[in-house]
């Protein structure tokens, strides 16, 4: 009798598993349909424009109560950026494991910080936002971005009202505006994280080859998994946020099993598993002098490179792991906008097709086709091979590339510092060097090229 009951239970378990797999398979198939992608992008764009309009309405408030206007704009910005996070966390089901010192964990989300991330993946900006969301600072997160992005609807306009630091990548033009923008953040009422991609552009083998040629010419240790960091943006940010920001978070992102995540994969509901290593470094331990700060950043990237090497061998970062829980607010915000915007869209489509007008139907189809092209174009902008060019002339990669050989041996620190200072002074005379094409890389700003 017991054997019969056991067999029945096993059969029931198998049926449940088969039913679950079938449901997951159907849901996974649904996620891959272009209609779903179109709806997701429709909701994002329309809700984004609505939020941009609401942000515009806060302009009078800035002259009355600046701090209140800032807080309102943080909440409005969250309505946009959290949709992207919900896409990663809830739609694709991507998981994120955090490697960090448990003693540092209580500080996350409770202090202002500069976050230094590697720039190897198409969705690393999205993982950075997810990191911010897990600790409640997504709405107030900052980046150093190209000036052109300020004119882009939805994200660019959102960033404008968030007081994002924009730059043209020409230091002689940027110096005044960048410094003023950073100084304005000194009295920001919300805890914020300032995200920096010090490499300035996404890693590719072609860019890496050019970068290491410069490293060889300048006597810098070569990096295997990173481009040479552009030190100017980092040093200026540290200098002008000192006293407000209390720490730098050295962050390194990787994906398990050599996965190469893409935004299109996320839209298709493909699940990835991200590993994020975060090391908290008190800002007081970073040199105030610009040349010494540049040396410090180069050493940091040597350490990041060694960390990446360990990950490639072992498949994990050193230290204990933590899994910050997903917060429900990103999903609830996303569902709110979906419900709000899909209902009028469905009514409109029903009325259009009910009219029976061939012209109306053809116009609707053409608009959908144009929208699909727009969606594909936006996705294409995140591809690694669409990143900025890296330049071919000597001196274009890094304004501080004249730094003499930096080693990890303490016995050579003094000589290295002296050589670095001399090299940086020489490089300050080369402001006019221009990169081939549209991207100016002669004077590093460490901008985020998402």
PLM region spans:
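Cytosol/nucleoplasm-facing, intrinsically disordered, low-complexity tails
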Residues: 1-22, 106-107, 244-245, 387-450
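Membrane-anchoring hydrophobic helices of lipid-metabolizing enzymes
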Residues: 2-114, 127, 398
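Alpha-helical bilayer-embedded segments of polytopic membrane proteins, i.e.
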Residues: 2-52, 322-380
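A structural signal for well-ordered alpha-helical scaffolds and beta->alpha junctions
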Residues: 77-82, 152, 230-234, 271
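Soluble catalytic domains of membrane acyltransferases
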Residues: 87-263
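Cytochrome P450
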Residues: 134-138, 344-365, 374, 426-428, ...
